[in-house]
Design a protein with these regions (language model features):
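Bacterial N-terminal signal peptides
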Residues: 6-16
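Conserved polar/disulfide-associated segments of primarily extracytoplasmic proteins
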Residues: 45-139
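Solvent-exposed, polar/charged alpha-helical surfaces in well-ordered, non-transmembrane soluble domains
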Residues: 33, 83-87, 155-162
Length: 167
């Protein structure tokens, strides 16, 4: 009986190791983020031609992330930038449906905005995290994916946004 119990405990310990989440740290020079699984891959790194980084969760339809640095007027709040983006950019996406704005806190604080749209005849969802770095800089983490897939990885998108850290 003791051997059976010891074997069961050993099995639990070893199986816990197999289910541990592998996290990879991505370093963009100005900031770092943690990618919650090896499925997340970098597809574009910031350079002279592209000032933003892009990532996919296996496939663009499963989850796509673009990180942009937004330089704003002094005193502009993340919610102000979110409202401006909704009014000037997102509203013109095909099939756009505005979602809700929520406060967000991690290493940097800000707001999130969710919305729905149509892309190549597929229903999509978008979620943007606006994170305030200082009174003139806001980072926008723009996630998009299929409407039935992106909400399933909300814990991963939140983890990525919470892990966003300036150097």
């Amino acid at each position: 009986m003791r051997h059976l119990l010891a074997g069961f405990v050993l099995f639990l310990l070893l199986s816990g190791c197999a289910f541990a989440v592998a996290q990879e740290v991505y370093d963009a020079g100005e900031y770092t983020i943690e990618l919650p699984s090896p499925v997340w891959k970098v597809i574009t790194e910031p350079d002279a031609a592209h000032e933003h980084a892009e990532f996919v969760n296996g496939d663009r339809l499963e989850g796509y992330l673009q990180i942009r640095k937004e330089v704003v007027d002094a005193g502009t709040a993340p919610s102000d930038l979110a409202r401006r983006d909704l009014d000037q950019k997102l509203r013109f996406l095909p099939g756009f449906v505005e979602g809700k704005e929520e406060k967000f806190s991690g290493r940097l604080s800000g707001v999130t905005v969710s919305y729905e749209f149509i892309k190549t005849a597929k229903p999509m969802t978008g979620r943007i995290y606006y994170l305030q770095a200082d009174n003139r800089t806001i980072y926008a983490l723009r996630f998009s994916g299929l409407r039935d897939r992106l909400p399933r990885i909300r814990n991963q998108t939140d983890l990525i946004a919470r892990s966003f850290k300036l150097k």
